[in-house]
Amino acid sequence: MFKIFRTKWFRSAPVLATLWLSSTAVILIGVNSYFPDYLFMPMS
């Protein structure tokens, strides 16, 4: 079922970079929805 995770295609650099950037963007958007100005003014 999870054979795609063991293939050479999935471990290539562009795929890993896309997954990393996408997950980082999702985390930042999620945090920004709960704390709207926290990313710009963290000390306020």
From Swiss-Prot:
It comes from the Bacteria. One of its GO terms (biological process) is photosynthesis. Signal peptide: none annotated. Keywords: Membrane, Photosynthesis, Photosystem I, Thylakoid, Transmembrane, Transmembrane helix. Its main location: membrane. One of its GO terms (cellular component) is plasma membrane-derived thylakoid membrane. It is found in: Cellular thylakoid membrane. May help in the organization of the PsaE and PsaF subunits. This is Photosystem I reaction center subunit IX 2.
